[in-house]
């Protein structure tokens, strides 16, 4: 630790950038996780050949001295070299506008440079796979611009498919169901909707036929334009909405009545089993000697009644 002490001012220059002035792979030795959450640099150890790597995005102080002179309004100072065309275009205007333009250009250059160095570091470390998303140190424009085209393509595909799906039910329901094979798009739709749409008059036919026959047969013939009855029975197999209410559960009063009638009809089969324990038979005659009064019935009555 003591041998690495003179490297600290080189790694942490007191510049206007603050935390951004660190090299991308380096982290402070006085490490706190609260700072690391706000720090845009990835929490990875530096590569072994840190000195020989040419990309160190430590921006020197002289660029910011030039920028300070331009912001003060000195016309003799030329703008920084990487962006001459916008600076020369705005040279005819007031120096305040030129200073603003150079400030925006410098900030965009800094973010671009850090993004490129981060990408190089990720490629060297093997972090660039398909599921990787960059950390929050990059701005939203720079994280998006690689994936915008794919997302737009997926959105267009999904919207096209949903529009097609919305058009198909209207076309299939407008066609009469006497010829279900006439609309070819019906096969591509879901089986649930197509089956129930063609077989909807099925329950009405079954209820009308199950009634008093000849009166309802004439009214049932009105439904024959929807197709032959055999077709509806075959299509309505498992998918149609049938008027089936399930096995109805008998009420408890009906159950008690049925049990009472059964016991009256077959007294031999419904005899309770006799207990062979002599103690119980001895105690069975005891309740006959008691004379029960009406107030005792409250105690002897079971709770379910």
Curated annotation (Swiss-Prot):
The keyword Oxidoreductase applies. This is Putative monooxygenase p33MONOX. Interacts with NELFB, NOL12 and PRNP. It holds the Pfam family P33MONOX. GO terms for molecular function: oxidoreductase activity. Belongs to the P33MONOX family. GO terms for cellular component: cytoplasm. Keywords: Cytoplasm, NADP, Oxidoreductase, Phosphoprotein. Residues 1-20, 36-96, 156-278 are annotated as: Disordered. It is found in: Cytoplasm. A motif (Flavin-containing monooxygenase motif) lies at residues 67-77. Its main location: cytoplasm. It comes from Bos taurus. The modification Phosphoserine is found at residue 183. The keyword Oxidoreductase applies. It is an enzyme of class 1 (oxidoreductase). The modification Phosphothreonine is found at residues 44, 175. Residues 169-185 have a biased composition (Low complexity). Potential NADPH-dependent oxidoreductase. May be involved in the regulation of neuronal survival, differentiation and axonal outgrowth. Residues 59-72 have a biased composition (Basic and acidic residues). Its EC number is 1.-.-.-. Residues 77-87 have a biased composition (Pro residues). The lineage of its organism: Eukaryota, Metazoa, Chordata, Craniata, Vertebrata.
